């Protein structure tokens, strides 16, 4: 089981995310879980709380479904943009496919594929897409570009559903394999390509294949450095989001085991959509569902006694817009007390 970070003499893990806010050395915070359990709402709310205690916060969606724009009622794209009503909270949504196109281009500002004139653009793109997990790797390549050019004290990831997230965290290996393949191709075809490119004026910016590979190697080194930070519990943590149902609990356990195998810290679980029927309620469905939820909540308490387990209620309306998100975010730091 994953190790929890216990602060001070407090052996009873409080049912909030206050420990995440208090840990001011954190630079990377991932929020993830099974699809449909409220990851985006939780990540947006956590980012709002972080903005109260940190100088600058960046919220990034790596989920192809991109729900940040819907959550805040504001359009976000691949460039970081301040969220309306905040001076230190920005958001962006990454398009993995667009990132691949950017990587294959040389960055001359025109967005043109330098291989297109050789009839090799599609081949290189097919090669990139054929590498398992390359969309997650490209997402992170885009993230690195933003991180190196902009300065944020803490970055919150609204991640894709579990499988994508776990692959996303393995991206250094994926990139190294891709670089090995490109190096092999360069050895075989580099001289020929350089001579052809020379006859055609070379790559945009006067680069050759060797320079392109050097850039890729530089990117790999940067990614290796970030990967080291990911495995440092002082700098990185993963907040699991689930609901009190069998499949979600099973997925959460699998995810925590994998995170532990990657040496990535996780000590917080947010359980969403909990029912708290009033005493004497004649709603049979509510009572039956609460009974089922309680069974899985008890299992969560038993399995993760060294975790901060946050219980969030099922709400009567969608959590969309700044005001509702701020109200929801308060329950992440102040335990919800159901009405009697």
Curated annotation (Swiss-Prot):
Q: What class of enzyme is it?
A: hydrolase
List positions binding Zn(2+): 283, 286
Swiss-Prot/TrEMBL keywords: ATP-binding, Cytoplasm, Endoplasmic reticulum, Hydrolase, Metal-binding, Nucleotide-binding, Transport, Zinc
Q: Which GO terms describe its biological process?
A: tail-anchored membrane protein insertion into ER membrane
Localization terms from the record? Cytoplasm; Endoplasmic reticulum
- One MF term in GO for this entry? ATP hydrolysis activity
User: What SUPFAM superfamilies does the entry give?
Assistant: P-loop containing nucleoside triphosphate hydrolases
Q: What does this protein do?
A: ATPase required for the post-translational delivery of tail-anchored (TA) proteins to the endoplasmic reticulum. Recognizes and selectively binds the transmembrane domain of TA proteins in the cytosol. This complex then targets to the endoplasmic reticulum by membrane-bound receptors, where the tail-anchored protein is released for insertion. This process is regulated by ATP binding and hydrolysis. ATP binding drives the homodimer towards the closed dimer state, facilitating recognition of newly synthesized TA membrane proteins. ATP hydrolysis is required for insertion.
Q: What is this protein called?
A: ATPase get3
The gene from which this protein is expressed is get3
